[in-house]
Structure formats: C-alpha cells, structure tokens
Amino acid sequence: RQRQMCIRDRIIAVVAAGGIAVPLSVHASAGELSHCLSVAGVRRLLLPSEMRSEGLDAVCEALGVEQLAVEDLPEPVPHALPLAGEQGALIVFTSGTTGKPKGVVHTVASISAMVTSLIEAWGWEATDVIPLFLPLHHVHGIVNILLCALWRGATVDLYARFDVEQVCQKVADDRYSVFMAVPTIYVKLMAYLKTLDDATRDQVTEGFANMRLNVSGSAACPVPL
C-alpha cells in the first residue's frame, strides 16, 4: 500500500511541476528498464532506496539518469504550475506482447478527455469507493481508476497487491460501490468463493450485487467467466 501511495503521489507531483511522469513496473528487468528509460528520455528516476540494485545503478549510470530516493526528497511545496492542454503529462508503456514496449505520450488535454468521458459513462460520484490493486504503470490503474476517482472526489482504497481475502471481507461489509479488475482477478475471486462456507459466500456475493458497477477490463473476458 505504501508503495502504491508513493507512486500515486509522485505521478501527480511530477505533472503538477510541469514534467512528464513515466510510471514503470517494479518487476521490470534491467534490460526492460534500460529500454523504457532510454526511449522516454528519462533524466531522473524516483524510487524507494530499498529498490536500488547494482543492475539498476549500472543502467542509470550508462544512460545518465539521476536516481532520487523518495524518502530523501524535501517537503512538498503547495504550489503547482499552470497546465497547458498540449503539455505532455504521462508516458505509459504498452505491455510489449507484440515486440518491445512502446511509450505512449498522454497530454494534459488527452487525459482530461479520457477521464471526463469515463466519469460520464460510468456515472462516477464523489460518494463512490473503489479498491485499487491494479498496477499503476498501465492505463487501467492510473486513468480508469485512480485519476477518475480523484477527479470526481471519490475514495480510493489502495492495496500493495491483490489480497483476495481482505478484498472479499470488505466487499462483504459493503465497503465498495465500484469494482474494476482484470479477468484473472475475477477467476481468483471465483476460486476463493468456492472455499468459503455458504453463509460467508452469500455475504460476499451480496456485497458484489450491491455495488452499482463492476468492470472487467484490460483483456477480453472469457465466455465461461
């Protein structure tokens, strides 16, 4: 959870300061990081100090990328630069299933268009509460969930990773009004439900039924699911 909060805060801070944020996977190999850092023209890499490694140090040294430990950064300044619509804000890399990941540039205007259209389509309200366990280096997690919720003033419940037991407990307690996940998450949920006693299973399924919106995205949902 702390890591997700760190990524969330740094993305917003970089854009507010007039820069372009390039969120990257914490599980990326040195080769993958080298490719992404080089293609995006990254000059500074923000990360927790415990994530530094010899491999990453070598990549950054070769590319002239300065590493900054997030815990050593100065206190935030309550000031943001005016944002122009054509200004670059995010570079999000594709998954790389058909070749090397490609960096897609999103401007302030394009993000605004995406977020406002999704808010209207999905009926986001300030009273909504949604869990966020998807990675924040893909559009689904960053835009569809995080930015839509923050834009509308809704509440985001951050997870470091998907915890099926904890998520289902909160669902049973009617904590969430919106739920967005990928098909593999729904497969894990269905498998977990089969391990529960009838009463607990009914509470969880009722919690899902009480939500106003459930979304499966990022990949095609299998017909059996």
Give the predicted meaning of each segment.
Residues L47-E54, A160, Y176-L225:
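Adenylate-forming
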Residues R10-A17, A21, C60, I111, ...:
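Short hydrophobic alpha-helical segments of the AMP-binding
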Residues I11, V15-L46, K102-V105, L132-F133, ...:
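Short beta-strand->loop structural element characteristic of the AMP-binding/adenylate-forming
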Residues Q2-I7:
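Short, small-residue-biased leader/transition segments that mark boundaries at the very start
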Residues S112-V129, V139-M180, K188, Y192-L196:
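Conserved AMP-binding/adenylation subdomain of ANL enzymes
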Residues V26-L56, E75, M114-P131, D163-S177:
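Conserved ATP-dependent adenylate/AMP-binding module captured primarily in the ANL superfamily
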Residues A89-V115:
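Conserved AMP-binding A3 loop
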Residues E75-F93, K100, G123-V129:
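Conserved pre-ATP/AMP-binding loop-to-beta segment of ANL
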